Amino acid sequence: NLVQFGFMIECAIRNRQPALDFMNYGCYCGTVGRGTPVDD
């Protein structure tokens, strides 16, 4: 799940908060996949 993924990345990258870094990652932000594209 996403929490376990965050802990795994945190072990590799110290002094960062990976859960927050990837919070807005994805094709679209917002509920149900609607909203402005986040990545091109």
From Swiss-Prot:
GO BP term (any one): phospholipid metabolic process
InterPro entries listed in its UniProt record: PLipase_A2, PLipase_A2_dom, PLipase_A2_dom_sf
Molecular function as annotated in GO: calcium ion binding; phospholipase A2 activity
Subcellular location as annotated: Secreted
Tissues with expression: Expressed by the venom gland.
GO cellular component: extracellular region
Keywords assigned: Disulfide bond, Secreted
Subunit: Heterotrimer of alpha, beta, and gamma chains; non-covalently linked.
Family stated for the protein in its record: Belongs to the phospholipase A2 family. Group I subfamily. D49 sub-subfamily.
Role description: Heterotrimer: Snake venom phospholipase A2 (PLA2) heterotrimer that acts as a potent presynaptic neurotoxin by blocking synaptic transmission and synaptic vesicle recycling. Enzymatic activity is essential for the neurotoxic effects. May act by binding in a calcium-dependent fashion to neurotonal pentraxin-1 (NPTX1) and neurotonal pentraxin-2 (NPTX2), but not to neuronal pentraxin receptor (NPTXR). Also binds to taipoxin-associated calcium binding protein 49 (RCN2), a protein localized in the lumen of endoplasmic reticulum.
Record-given protein name: Neutral phospholipase A2 homolog cannitoxin beta chain 2
Organism in which the protein naturally occurs: Oxyuranus scutellatus canni
